[in-house]
Amino acid sequence: MMIGEQLLKKLFPDFEELVQPAGIDLRVDKVYRQMGPGSLIDDEKNLPPLEMLEPPIYRLEPGKAYLASVDRMIEIPEGYAMLYLPRSTLLRSFVSVQTAVGDPGFRGTLQFLLHNHGEYEYTLKRGERIVQAVVFPVEGSGKYSGSYQE
């Protein structure tokens, strides 16, 4: 069962103005381009070097992927998980957002992959809503303790 507007406002009071009937809108803050290789071998993470694009207007080149962070930290309460879905305006503009699961107990700044699949540049302004987080209860879960915890 997905969590609705009233409970979302109680669970995530810092996001009250972004709560929708079935989720929480999240806004883009910083956008980065990849500047070199990365790897994941035998569970060893070597993230690629990044270069931050100059805000407040981000220009996404056709066929390119970018890492985007949201404008504030989030804390997912124990017993709940988040899934992140792209805003339909981006999809209608040939821009996809690739995401992961937000585990119970995660606290930190979320990052997503933006990919301009179109033939033309796409312009995105800092502060625009790019994803909607939907929240589900999770029974019998532990708490996130991975390397991206802040």
Swiss-Prot record:
<dbReference type="Pfam" id="PF22769">
    <property type="entry name" value="DCD"/>
</dbReference>
<protein>
    <recommendedName>
        <fullName>Probable deoxyuridine 5'-triphosphate nucleotidohydrolase</fullName>
        <ecNumber>3.6.1.23</ecNumber>
    </recommendedName>
</protein>
<dbReference type="GO" id="GO:0006226">
    <property type="term" value="P:dUMP biosynthetic process"/>
</dbReference>
<keyword id="KW-0546">Nucleotide metabolism</keyword>
<dbReference type="InterPro" id="IPR036157">
    <property type="entry name" value="dUTPase-like_sf"/>
</dbReference>
<comment type="pathway">
    <text>Pyrimidine metabolism; dUMP biosynthesis; dUMP from dCTP (dUTP route): step 2/2.</text>
</comment>
<dbReference type="GO" id="GO:0006229">
    <property type="term" value="P:dUTP biosynthetic process"/>
</dbReference>
<keyword id="KW-0378">Hydrolase</keyword>
<dbReference type="InterPro" id="IPR033704">
    <property type="entry name" value="dUTPase_trimeric"/>
</dbReference>
<comment type="function">
    <text>This enzyme is involved in nucleotide metabolism: it produces dUMP, the immediate precursor of thymidine nucleotides and it decreases the intracellular concentration of dUTP so that uracil cannot be incorporated into DNA.</text>
</comment>
<dbReference type="InterPro" id="IPR023537">
    <property type="entry name" value="dUTPase_archaeal"/>
</dbReference>
<dbReference type="GO" id="GO:0004170">
    <property type="term" value="F:dUTP diphosphatase activity"/>
</dbReference>
<dbReference type="InterPro" id="IPR011962">
    <property type="entry name" value="dCTP_deaminase"/>
</dbReference>
<comment type="similarity">
    <text>Belongs to the dCTP deaminase family. Archaeal dUTPase subfamily.</text>
</comment>
<dbReference type="GO" id="GO:0008829">
    <property type="term" value="F:dCTP deaminase activity"/>
</dbReference>
